[in-house]
């Protein structure tokens, strides 16, 4: 009901991403900690959490290594000092989200985590979703740009020359590349709200550079004013 209301500013999913350039793809192991942090920090519930990793080359090895790390994170009671996941207030929600993901899988995606940890889990009286990593080889797959209220990410393969035009709306993009052409394409992209150049986790913010502007900009109109003295 607020979509057409100019007095309401609507913020949707972040669909934040990590992009690995062709010049860095052979060194992807160096960025595993960065990827895990970007996906899992704050329980994976923030719009600035990475929900996809975009790469220009076959990515099964990346998906397997990343899944191995994510599968070590699982539901724990909320008072456990090792707990990293958030429970859902509505215990039915994890089951619905898990079913939604399964319904969109199809033949072009693979859930790397199945067989290690069940996605829906109970711990300490709470209901959780364990981290889920999807590997897709087609950017048009519905899960390539999916975002859910838990540590979920898709590893997406797409040629670098078409990558920027295919990533879609992106709140935060961390670009692991020194390729100036790719950097310039990302700088010029209207899809990217916040661009991190180099190994900066997607969830690391600089508060003096708000990626969606200041509330002042929305509530007030700036105007230049001059008045003759006297």
What does each model-found stretch correspond to?
Residues 1-138:
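ALDH superfamily catalytic-core signature
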Residues 36-37, 68-72, 121-230:
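Conserved C-terminal structural/oligomerization subdomain of aldehyde/semialdehyde dehydrogenase
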């Amino acid at each position: 009901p607020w979509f057409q209301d100019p007095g309401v500013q609507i913020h949707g999913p972040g669909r934040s991403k990590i992009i690995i350039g062709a010049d860095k793809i052979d060194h992807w192991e160096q960025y595993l900690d960065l990827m895990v942090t970007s996906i899992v920090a704050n329980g994976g519930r923030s719009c600035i959490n990475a929900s996809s990793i975009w790469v220009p080359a076959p990515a099964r090895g990346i998906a397997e290594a990343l899944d191995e790390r994510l599968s070590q994170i699982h539901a724990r009671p909320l008072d456990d000092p090792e707990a990293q996941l958030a429970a859902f207030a509505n215990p039915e929600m994890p089951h619905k989200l898990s079913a939604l993901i399964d319904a969109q899988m199809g033949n072009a995606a693979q859930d790397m985590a199945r067989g290690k940890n069940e996605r829906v889990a109970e711990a300490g009286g709470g209901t959780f979703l364990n981290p889920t990593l999807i590997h897709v080889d087609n950017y048009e797959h519905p899960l390539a740009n999916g975002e859910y209220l838990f540590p979920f990410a898709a590893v997406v393969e797409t040629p670098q020359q078409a990558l920027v035009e295919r990533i879609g709306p992106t709140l935060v993009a961390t670009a692991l590349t020194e390729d100036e052409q790719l950097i310039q394409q990302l700088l010029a992209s209207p899809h990217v709200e916040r661009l991190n150049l180099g190994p900066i986790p997607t969830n690391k913010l600089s508060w003096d550079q708000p990626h969606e502007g200041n509330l002042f900009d929305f509530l007030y109109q700036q105007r230049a004013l001059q008045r003759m003295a006297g």
